[in-house]
Amino acid sequence: MAADPSPPSAMAQPRPLNLNNEVVKMRKEVKRIRVLVIRKLVRSVSRLKSKKGSEDALLKNQRRAQRLLQEIHAMKELKPDVITKSALNDDINFEKTCKKPDSTATERAIARLAVHPLLKRKVDALKAAIQAFKDARQNAPEAESSKSASKESQCEDIPRSQAEASESQHPERTVVGEQKGKDKDPTTAKKAGSGSKEKLAKGKQGPKAVATPHSPGKPSEKGAGINSERQGAPTPGNHSQGKASTRTTEDSVCEPDDNSISKEEVSEEEKEYFDDSTEERFYKQSSASEDSDSGDDFFIGKVRRTRKKECAVPSSAKEQKPLPKVSSKTNTLETHWDIRNDKHKLIPEARKLESVFFHSLSGPKSSRRDPREQAPKNKAPDIPENEPPIQNKFTKSARRGFESAKQPSYAPLHPSWEASRRRKEQQSKIAVFQGKKITFDD
């Protein structure tokens, strides 16, 4: 039978193989295989006993059945560990054991169980694991010896490489030594020393000569008189360059100051501006007559306070401060501010002839186009233009009283409060006519 390609877990693990543990793990498999073999033998015994034929054939079948019963009893008495150990130790051949005339029932039972495919698969896997473990133990000292040999060879290679590197450097040293030997003569040494000194002096003088025109404040010792004369009478070009540099520095100093002042003014104007659209709309809708009196009253909140503070500041303090350079951003902000003020001043003047209930209808087209007061387009107007005026049932006295009720100006209220007040007034006027009896003349 072919061995199982997948070895057990113990084989895969690197720890040393413990055979006793593997034998103990095999107990369950051995018991299961023993039950299967006993069932098969019982069926074969019953088949042999049921066969019919001549007397010789019947006797032969009885002897076979007797031997199988002996094997069954031997299997029941055997322990699983004995079966696994015997299967691992020897290569058992069932046919050879059965042909032996002196073979016992236990031997035949062990051979029969060891030959079973399931147990044979497990046993072959264990044998392979044991063999691998033995090979690993045998190869371990060989591997250690090979490692030590490789380390020694590496250690030997390092000094060799160092020696080769030193040898490669030695020829240069020899050449330098020969040159030194040649230069030992006093005349040649003096000449070489004088030549080197001259070269050094020239090298030192070169950078000084180059540096003198750039740094007139540090003249050399040789040309001190010439440099002093040049310093005493500087050229006009240098003067102009110095003035230009001073101007550029002054401009660069002044520019950040102007920028900082303009930024501060812009930030102050942005802080001072406070536009609460809800308050503005409420103030316009509730008190149109008051708006017509004072042009700047539509500003609510912080704008009034800031304007009062600016008016309170004396003009002398403003004259003392120099006017800073205003940037283009501040100019644009001021123009926007003035345009907005002019627009808002024109709105209350145009609203002098407004009706009490419908501001948007009585005002001009420009006021109707104001997005804050423009009604949504999908809603139908309260009073269509083409319809005739509704015939009022009120008497002349009631109309006069209603008109007189319109005249007194109330204090500015919230729009919801004004609507509730008007609704109550209308209900009180209508309640007068509900209790009257209608009489008809004959």
UniProtKB/Swiss-Prot annotation:
Pfam families (UniProt xref): BUD22
Q: What ranges does the record give for the region Disordered, renumbered to this chain?
A: 137-336, 358-442
Query: Which GO cellular component terms, listed alphabetically, does the Swiss-Prot or TrEMBL entry include?
Result: 90S preribosome; nucleus; perinuclear region of cytoplasm
Subcellular location, record wording? Cytoplasm, Perinuclear region
Question: What is an annotated GO biological process for this record, any one?
Answer: maturation of SSU-rRNA
Polar residues: which segments have biased composition? 237-247
* UniProt biased composition (Basic and acidic residues): 149-159, 167-188, 367-382
Q: Enumerate composition-biased segments (Acidic residues).
A: 266-278
Superkingdom, according to UniProt?
Answer: Eukaryota
Chain residue numbers at which the record places covalent cross-link Glycyl lysine isopeptide (Lys-Gly) (interchain with G-Cter in SUMO2): K202, K329
Coiled-coil positions: 55-77, 118-140
Q: Provide this UniProt record's keywords sorted from A to Z.
A: Coiled coil, Cytoplasm, Isopeptide bond, Phosphoprotein, Transcription, Transcription regulation, Ubl conjugation
Q: Give the sites modified to Phosphoserine.
A: S215, S277, S292, S294, S362
Q: Function of this protein?
A: May be involved in regulating transcriptional activation of cardiac genes during the aging process. May play a role in biosynthesis and/or processing of SLC2A4 in adipose cells.
Quaternary structure and interacting proteins, as annotated: Interacts with SRF. Forms complexes with SRF and SRF cofactors ARID2, MYOCD and NKX2-5. Interacts with the N-terminus of SLC2A4.
Name of this chain's protein:
Serum response factor-binding protein 1
**Source species:** Rattus norvegicus (Rat)
Record gene name: Srfbp1
